[in-house]
């Protein structure tokens, strides 16, 4: 019963805040707010240049492997649990899926910086 009440309150608050943010007028919109900020100086060129898709993909790959490290760091403490076989199986599957993804990226030249 408590979980349902908390869920209802959270949903109501979220919807209320979204509604208020949507209906409030946007005040003080002028060109200076839309411009780029370069340490107080006027920008020398356009700051809205698109960046390379390769850079984006390498960044996403880095984030995935960073997440892998955070998932594998508590593994030595998990080995002290009663079900060591299941822990090893799950960690092996995680590393295997990520290794297969890395091999796929490597064979399709997704990790090369130059085109």
From Swiss-Prot:
Top-level division of the source organism's lineage: Eukaryota
Classification via Gene3D superfamilies: NADH:ubiquinone/plastoquinone oxidoreductase, chain 3
Annotated keywords: Electron transport, Membrane, Mitochondrion, Mitochondrion inner membrane, NAD, Respiratory chain, Translocase, Transmembrane, Transmembrane helix, Transport, Ubiquinone
Alphabetical GO biological process terms: mitochondrial electron transport, NADH to ubiquinone
Transmembrane segments: 4-24, 55-75, 84-104
Bilayer topology term: Multi-pass membrane protein
Catalyses which reaction(s): a ubiquinone + NADH + 5 H(+)(in) = a ubiquinol + NAD(+) + 4 H(+)(out)
One Gene Ontology cellular component annotation held by this UniProt entry: NADH dehydrogenase complex
A Pfam family per the record: Oxidored_q4
Places the protein is found: Mitochondrion inner membrane
Family affiliation: Belongs to the complex I subunit 3 family.
Subunit structure: Core subunit of respiratory chain NADH dehydrogenase (Complex I) which is composed of 45 different subunits. Interacts with TMEM186. Interacts with TMEM242.
Protein name: NADH-ubiquinone oxidoreductase chain 3
Species assigned in the record: Eligmodontia typus
Gene name, Swiss-Prot/TrEMBL: MT-ND3
